[in-house]
């Protein structure tokens, strides 16, 4: 459960693509320490762009990104230091195919953070054991399933000891059978108090993991609410329409049965 200390704050974030196409239209959001914020919304609404802006992978045109009281988006030369504090996991894993699992895990802490190899190796092995993949430490990514690769990607970020984790549709490329093993890791992180911002289309997972739901549409935050309230009684028509999409199949089956 989140405490009252604000860890990350976004103030009037605006982002435009080429030709003046707006991606984010003045997004403001505060995230408390140990809070899990799940961002929902239709494809193309700016969810992933927002995460990439937080991590410095996309440049914003105006606004401020504040981490623990310090504005982090004004000095571009410090982004390599800031990214060490903000872990990000993508749907495409981003593992180096020519490196073993352990080599992938050690790369950032050793090359970027200049940490002791023995210390990082012990940390990596503990994390691998925790997710049931210690026996894969000498394997290459090509030898792993999609679910295993995504768990390795999460551990790689954790090895950098981040203050906040960003997850961008991490189950989107997985077979249904592999989705649960990845979501279980994220649920455990939430229980342990990791601050997380999660973009997902897994509605049941969102209900289970979120302290707060943020609904976006067309580059703006349209609605924010507690999970139970959001899913039971969304405040905006746009959110209602979005949630009805996920109820369509069930509704269609019921109506078909009534016609028989």
Per-range role (PLM):
Residues 1-14, 251-260:
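ABC-family P-loop ATPase nucleotide-binding domain
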Residues 5-8, 14-218, 222-223:
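ABC family nucleotide-binding domain
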Residues 224, 228-260:
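C-terminal boundary and immediately downstream tail of ABC-type ATPase nucleotide-binding domains
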């Amino acid at each position: 459960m989140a405490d009252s200390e604000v860890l990350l704050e976004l103030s009037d974030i605006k982002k435009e693509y080429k030709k003046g196409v707006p991606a984010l239209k003045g997004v403001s959001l505060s995230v408390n320490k140990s809070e899990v914020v799940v961002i929902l919304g239709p494809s193309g609404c700016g969810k992933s762009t927002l995460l990439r802006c937080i991590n410095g992978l996309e440049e914003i045109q105006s606004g401020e990104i504040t981490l623990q009281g310090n504005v982090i988006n004004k000095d571009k030369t410090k982004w390599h230091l800031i990214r060490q504090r903000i872990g990000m996991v993508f749907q495409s894993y981003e593992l180096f195919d020519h490196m073993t699992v352990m080599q992938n895990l050690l790369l950032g802490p050793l090359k970027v953070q200049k940490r002791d190899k023995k210390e990082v190796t012990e940390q990596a092995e503990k994390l691998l054991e925790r997710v049931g993949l210690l026996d894969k430490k000498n394997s290459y990514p090509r030898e792993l399933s999609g679910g295993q690769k995504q768990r390795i990607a999460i551990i790689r970020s954790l090895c950098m000891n981040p203050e906040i984790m960003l997850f961008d549709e991490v189950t989107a490329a997985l077979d249904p059978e592999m989705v649960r093993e990845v979501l279980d890791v994220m649920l455990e992180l939430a229980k342990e108090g990791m601050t997380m911002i999660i973009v997902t289309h897994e509605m049941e997972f969102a209900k289970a993991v979120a302290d707060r739901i943020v609904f976006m549409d067309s580059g703006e935050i349209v609605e924010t609410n507690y999970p139970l309230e959001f899913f039971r009684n969304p405040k905006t028509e746009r959110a209602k329409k979005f949630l009805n999409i996920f109820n369509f199949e069930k509704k269609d089956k019921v109506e078909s049965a009534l016609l028989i």
